[in-house]
């Protein structure tokens, strides 16, 4: 194989994904996906590439598209196709039409399993390609946004096969959402702006695990962080973690930067942009491009121009100017390299083992959203802990007896 840029990026990722490496040993021997067709819509970059190769090495026929028009690494796409013979349908900067055409192409070989990030592929096989659903065992969903859509489908009674919520596994959301999103979001912002974080007023919209990860990293780099929330419990958490909590339309007046991480649309409205500080930086860490109302901002703008790679400046009707990174799309992948390799090692290990569980147990599953089995969550945690060099205490027989008793007190 020619050692091109994409090939080297894949090899680098493989070298730093020890949990996947451990699982790979067994998959190579047992071939748990032999004869299984898997359609995937994920961010097509190096870590995802190693995950897709793991499934292929486990016997699967994998077809992959991107789950976001701006998140693909073209060098990795080329290497997967050329060096590994994998059908991959993606490029960075897809048009909306290309994006949906590529999703369709993953379905040209009818899938037994789908692995999705954000829910667009799942929606496709529940609408335009509903004819394929009868042969689908089930699937996995990677991210918060997609899980919200899945649960809405389940509630409406339209879910046609079982889906696993990988996002809410402990070894996913406690690490990927918090440490992964926190680091990679700032990586994307700093890569695209070259601006200082220390001393800046930064608004973080949303204090779920993604938002708190971003806020934690900003605080560590010296930013003054203001949080916006709709949930009083999370707002109280933010305050006790040392952050101010304000309404967006108030906070944005003092902010040098706003980062959204909510999974909700119109978090930063056009009305907010009008009262923002001049040249405020607007970035989105959520899955879709509607958290910052970019279309509304563009509609009412007098001028739009690209001021840096990935950054567009809009001059608004009142003369104010705002800088939007990556058209309001997922900043860590559109303007950066995505989550750290070791973080995605955990998430994709969960994905692989849950897909294996689905193959073995799909006949006993209903048309509903399932959590990742706790034994899989714990297994991934144990492998990673061992690789960190960590060791666990074990309970004595007397402690186990105490744990299960009710009559011992003070």
UniProtKB/Swiss-Prot annotation:
One GO MF term: adenosylhomocysteinase activity
Residues holding substrate: 117, 142, 172, 176
Free-text remark on how the cofactor is bound: Binds 1 NAD(+) per subunit.
Pfam families membership: AdoHcyase (PF05221), AdoHcyase_NAD (PF00670)
Enzyme class: hydrolase
Catalytic activity: S-adenosyl-L-homocysteine + H2O = L-homocysteine + adenosine
E.C. designation(s): 3.13.2.1
Record field: transmembrane: none
Pathways involved: Amino-acid biosynthesis; L-homocysteine biosynthesis; L-homocysteine from S-adenosyl-L-homocysteine: step 1/1
Ranges in a coiled coil: none
Annotated CDD domains: SAHH
SMART domains reported for this sequence: AdoHcyase, AdoHcyase_NAD
One of the protein's GO biological processes: L-homocysteine biosynthetic process
Gene Ontology CC annotations of this record: cytosol
Co-factor requirement: NAD(+)
Binding site for NAD(+): 143-145, 177, 206-211, 229, 285-287, 332
Keyword check for Phosphoprotein: no
Superkingdom of this protein's organism: Archaea
Keyword Nucleotide-binding: no
Annotated localization: Cytoplasm
Family designation: Belongs to the adenosylhomocysteinase family.
Identification of the protein by name: Adenosylhomocysteinase
Naturally occurring in which organism (per UniProt): Thermoplasma volcanium (strain ATCC 51530 / DSM 4299 / JCM 9571 / NBRC 15438 / GSS1)
Lineage: Archaea, Methanobacteriati, Thermoplasmatota, Thermoplasmata, Thermoplasmatales
Gene encoding the protein: ahcY
């Amino acid at each position: 194989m020619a050692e091109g840029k994409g090939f080297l990026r894949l090899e680098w990722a493989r070298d730093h994904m020890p949990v996947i490496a451990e699982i790979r040993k067994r998959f190579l021997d047992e071939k748990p996906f032999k004869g299984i067709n898997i359609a995937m819509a994920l961010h097509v970059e190096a870590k995802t590439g190693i995950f897709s190769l793991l499934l292929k090495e486990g016997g699967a026929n994998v077809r992959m598209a991107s789950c976001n028009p701006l998140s693909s690494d073209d060098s990795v796409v080329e290497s997967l196709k050329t060096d590994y013979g994998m059908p991959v349908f993606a490029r960075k900067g897809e048009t909306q039409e290309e994006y949906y055409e590529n999703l369709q192409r993953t379905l040209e070989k009818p899938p037994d399993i789908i692995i999705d990030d954000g829910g667009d592929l799942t929606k496709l096989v529940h609408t335009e390609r509903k004819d394929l659903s009868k042969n689908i065992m089930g699937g996995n969903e990677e991210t918060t946004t997609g899980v919200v859509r899945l649960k809405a489908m389940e509630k409406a009674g339209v879910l046609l096969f079982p889906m696993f919520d990988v996002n809410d596994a402990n070894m996913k959301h406690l690490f990927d959402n918090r440490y992964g999103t926190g680091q990679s979001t700032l990586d994307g912002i700093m890569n695209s702006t070259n601006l200082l974080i220390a001393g800046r007023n930064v608004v973080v919209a949303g204090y779920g695990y993604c938002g708190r990860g971003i806020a934690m990293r900003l605080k560590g780099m010296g930013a003054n962080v203001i949080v916006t929330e709709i949930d009083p419990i999370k707002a109280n958490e933010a305050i006790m973690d040392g952050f101010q909590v304000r309404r967006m339309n108030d906070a944005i007046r003092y902010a040098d930067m706003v980062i959204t991480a909510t999974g909700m649309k119109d978090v930063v409205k056009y009305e907010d942009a009008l009262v923002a500080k001049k040249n405020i930086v607007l970035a989105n860490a959520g899955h879709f491009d509607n958290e910052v109302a970019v279309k509304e901002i563009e509609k009412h703008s007098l001028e739009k121009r690209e001021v840096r790679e990935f950054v567009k400046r809009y001059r608004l009707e009142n003369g104010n100017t705002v800088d939007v990174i990556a058209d309001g799309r997922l900043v860590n992948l559109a303007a950066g390299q995505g989550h750290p390799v070791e973080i995605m090692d955990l998430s994709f290990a969960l994905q692989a083992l849950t897909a294996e569980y689905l193959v073995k147990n799909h006949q006993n599953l209903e048309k509903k959203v399932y959590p990742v089995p706790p034994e899989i969550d714990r297994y991934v945690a144990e492998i990673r802990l061992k690789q960190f060099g960590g060791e666990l205490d074990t309970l004595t027989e007397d402690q186990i007896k105490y744990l299960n008793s009710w009559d011992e007190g003070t």
